[in-house]
Amino acid sequence: MVDMLGFISDQLDQLGVPYEFGEWTGEISYPYFVGSFNETEHRLEDGYTGGVFTLDGWSRGSKLTLAEINDKLKKAFEDLRAVQEGTAFFITYWNGLMIPTGEEDLFRITITLNTNEWKGA
């Protein structure tokens, strides 16, 4: 899981997405994104771990910023395959969903990625 989270963090950094895992600890500056991970399957025999990575983003003033980042992530994670230090990653974009916040100028999006990781590749 740690390798997968590090790989995704590197990808988000390269794309210029302001991101932290678990919770935002820095000074609030919009937009910002916080990630979480849910492991859905683990197989010891072939080193496979499957999961769902969720990225929650917030923006003030405009939904467009979130939609633009969603489009950027959709393209980057459309069919991302990589091998790093003996671990293979296959990540696909699943969906992006705008979620009402109840505040007039605060906007939220949840972006979901399917993750697949094989150790010892």
Residues of each region from the PLM?
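Low-complexity, acidic Ser/Thr/Pro/Gly-rich terminal tails and inter-domain linkers that flank the onset
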Residues: 31-34
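Charged, amphipathic alpha-helical segments and their flanking helix caps
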Residues: 1-23, 27, 37-121
